[in-house]
Structure formats: structure tokens, C-alpha cells
């Protein structure tokens, strides 16, 4: 008997509902053409949930996610809710509690530059990226300086000061290191661990444990870079990297650097997962309220987020590869949305891009 997959779909705010409609087209193809048994249930999240139910993360949404195998997330937030206290705004009051509730301790951020879109990259003149690049940034999500205690802001002798604490426990580093090495075996068998071990004790522990874990993966090549050198090396030659293994803070920095050198954040998916392989899959960009409702948003990041769900959440790598290949196929044919077009007078609308990707998937292109 074939497994039935349950997906909680959370379109959210801004362009979220628009691009999610295009992901639905791919989901229907998975059901009808690939004979996957997928149960889809949609729930409110973020600003729309605040407006309708008074909270950004309603109880029925959380329960729906608990009863699912994965979460397909759109985007949350917008100017409409910026007058609220920061802790009640959609971004803070929905996405962060979801991550905490499900203990989503690591984030996968692919940064892929397609050769057809090289003209978008700030590094387009570099010969080293003429064929594009493909980096996977693995970021620890639940430890480090964003969560360490003590933290605060105080005043002493009329002098104000603030402090945060970088804390990492050995088990936190150990588990994400295993994730990185296991994923490296599905790619190019290369891991570059990022730290500041020449200055920080937390980074020294990070390097020691990552090195120790690497002994279990003799087929995977491990290298180490200090964060300051890594930021330069990525700009100099991104092709030298495959997997970047990062702490929370360093991963926050490097994943955005990797994103911007691809030229369009509208192309980039992401996934946050826990030890049971339960994950939340979402575009790396935001809700983009300035273009919401105009049918010009790029749906590719949302579609590729679904592909990541199929790859990591369902463990159906061959089908995920076919979704990825469909995106590559339409790019090779010259199809573009506004954000990735070099001709502002010739680009596809959001729904049109979804249609051509769906057709490519059906036709096996």
C-alpha cells in the first residue's frame, strides 16, 4: 500500500497566496501523474490569521501542522501590521513559534546560480561562475548568540551597556555536523565548516566537535574557514564550495551573502527540519507586499520549496529531481518573470510561469 502524505499548506500574507497557487499546480501533478497519495489542508498564518482570528498562529493551524508530515509555508508580514508591538507582528508571532514548537534545529538554504541567469549576479564578470554555482548553506537554528543567556541592556555609573552570550552545547554541534556530512554524501562529498576559532571559545568547541564527527565520514572532505575569510572566499570563487556548515549567527550572514550573488532571491527555497525529519519549507524571500496582487511575483522559489519537501520530507529524490529539472528546462527556453528578465517588456506573469513549469513536469522536460 502506498504511503499517504499529509501536507499543511500555510500561504500567509503578501505574495504568499499567489505563489502558493502555482505550487498547488505541481502538487496536483504529483497526485495525478505520479500517483502520490497527498492529503492537503490549508490553514491561516501570519497577518491574515491576526485579522481573522486575533492571533498570528491559531491553535487549529498548530494542530493541523502537528497532524501533518510537512509544512509548506508561503510568507508572512507586511506594512499593515508594522504598528503592532514587535513580539505580536506576524513574522515574530508565527514563524518563530513554529520553529520552536517543532524543534526545527537546522536550516537548509540552497544558493544556486543557473548559467542562464548569470547576467543577474553581481559576480557575472567572473569566469569562475560561467557555468553557475550550487552551494548549500546549513545553518544551526536553535542555539548560539540569538538564544544564549544572559543577555540584556543595563546602566551602571551613568554608562549604558548591552550584552549577549554565545552558547553552544556539544550535542547541538554534534547533531548538525552529522546532518552536514550525511548531506555531503548526496552531493560532492565536501563540507566547509565556518567558525572564528582563533578568537571565540564557542567556535573552538565547534571546530573540535566538527572535526571529531568527520572521522565517521572518511569519504567526505572537511575544511575549516574563519567567518571573515569565508565572506571573501565566497565572493572570490563561490564554485569552490559545496556545503557550508555554520552556527546560527554565521549562517544568518553567509546564507544571505550566498543568496544575493545568485541575483534574485525569488529563485531561492529553504527548509528547516528537526531530528525526526519533520520540516517547514518556504521561499527564502519575504512577503513582498509592494508587488502583492500584481501577478508578477516569481513562483519558482515556492515551487522549489515544494521540491525540497519532496526530497527531504518524502524522501522521493527522483521526483524532486524532475521538479528541479522542469525549472531548469523553462529557464533554458528563455521563460522569465519580471525579477529575472533582462527585458522589462517581455516577461511571464506569476500564473504563466507556474503553467510552463507544470507543463514541463508533465512532459518530462
UniProtKB/Swiss-Prot annotation:
Necessary cofactors: Mg(2+); Mn(2+)
The entry's keywords: Amino-acid biosynthesis, Branched-chain amino acid biosynthesis, Cytoplasm, Leucine biosynthesis, Magnesium, Manganese, Metal-binding, NAD, Oxidoreductase, Plasmid
Residue(s) at site: Important for catalysis: 146, 196
Subcellular location: Cytoplasm
Family of the protein in this entry: Belongs to the isocitrate and isopropylmalate dehydrogenases family. LeuB type 1 subfamily.
Coiled-coil intervals: none
Cofactor note: Binds 1 Mg(2+) or Mn(2+) ion per subunit.
Binding residues annotated for Mg(2+), in chain numbering: 228, 252, 256
Role noted for this protein: Catalyzes the oxidation of 3-carboxy-2-hydroxy-4-methylpentanoate (3-isopropylmalate) to 3-carboxy-4-methyl-2-oxopentanoate. The product decarboxylates to 4-methyl-2 oxopentanoate.
One GO CC term on file: cytosol
A GO term, aspect molecular function: magnesium ion binding
Binding residues annotated for NAD(+), in chain numbering: 78-91, 286-298
Name of the molecule in the record: 3-isopropylmalate dehydrogenase
Pathway: Amino-acid biosynthesis; L-leucine biosynthesis; L-leucine from 3-methyl-2-oxobutanoate: step 3/4
UniProt-listed SUPFAM superfamilies: Isocitrate/Isopropylmalate dehydrogenase-like
EC number: 1.1.1.85
Subunit structure comment from the entry: Homodimer.
PROSITE patterns on file: IDH_IMDH
Binding site for substrate: 99, 109, 139, 228
Amino acid at each position: 500500500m502506498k504511503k499517504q502524505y499529509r501536507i499543511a499548506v500555510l500561504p500567509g500574507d503578501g505574495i504568499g497566496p499567489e505563489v502558493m497557487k502555482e505550487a498547488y499546480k505541481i502538487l496536483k501533478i504529483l497526485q495525478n501523474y505520479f500517483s502520490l497519495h497527498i492529503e492537503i489542508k490549508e490553514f491561516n498564518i501570519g497577518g491574515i490569521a491576526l485579522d481573522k482570528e486575533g492571533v498570528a498562529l491559531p491553535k487549529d493551524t498548530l494542530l493541523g501542522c502537528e497532524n501533518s508530515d510537512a509544512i509548506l509555508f508561503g510568507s508572512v508580514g507586511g506594512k499593515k501590521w508594522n504598528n503592532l508591538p514587535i513580539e505580536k507582528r506576524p513574522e515574530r508571532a508565527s514563524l518563530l513559534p513554529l520553529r520552536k514548537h517543532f524543534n526545527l534545529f537546522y536550516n537548509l538554504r540552497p544558493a544556486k546560480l543557473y548559467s542562464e541567469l548569470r547576467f543577474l549576479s553581481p559576480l557575472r564578470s567572473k569566469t569562475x561562475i560561467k557555468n553557475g554555482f550550487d552551494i548549500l548553506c546549513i545553518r544551526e537554528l536553535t542555539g548560539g548568540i540569538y538564544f544564549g543567556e544572559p543577555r540584556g541592556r543595563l546602566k551602571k555609573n551613568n554608562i549604558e551597556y548591552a550584552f549577549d552570550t554565545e552558547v553552544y552545547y556539544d550535542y547541538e554541534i554534534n547533531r548538525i555536523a552529522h546532518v552536514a556530512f550525511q548531506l555531503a554524501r548526496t552531493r560532492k562529498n565536501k563540507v566547509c565548516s565556518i567558525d572564528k576559532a582563533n578568537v571565540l571559545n564557542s567556535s573552538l568547541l565547534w571546530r573540535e566537535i566538527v572535526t571529531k564527527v568527520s572521522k565517521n565520514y572518511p569519504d567526505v572532505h572537511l575544511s575549516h574557514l574563519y567567518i571573515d575569510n569565508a565572506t571573501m572566499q565566497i565572493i572570490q570563487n563561490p564554485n569552490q564550495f559545496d556545503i557550508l556548515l555554520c552556527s546560527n549567527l554565521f549562517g544568518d550572514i553567509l546564507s544571505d551573502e550566498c543568496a544575493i550573488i545568485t541575483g534574485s532571491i525569488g529563485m531561492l527555497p529553504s527548509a528547516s527540519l528537526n531530528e525526526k525529519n519533520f520540516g517547514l519549507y518556504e521561499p527564502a524571500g519575504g512577503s513582498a507586499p509592494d508587488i502583492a496582487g500584481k501577478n508578477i511575483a516569481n513562483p519558482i522559489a515556492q515551487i522549489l520549496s515544494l521540491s525540497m519537501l519532496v526530497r527531504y520530507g518524502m524522501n522521493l529524490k527522483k521526483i524532486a529531481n524532475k521538479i528541479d529539472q522542469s525549472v531548469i528546462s523553462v529557464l533554458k527556453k528563455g521563460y522569465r518573470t519580471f525579477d529575472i528578465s533582462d527585458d522589462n517588456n517581455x516577461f511571464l506573469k506569476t500564473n504563466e510561469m507556474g503553467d510552463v513549469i507544470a507543463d514541463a513536469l508533465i512532459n518530462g522536460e
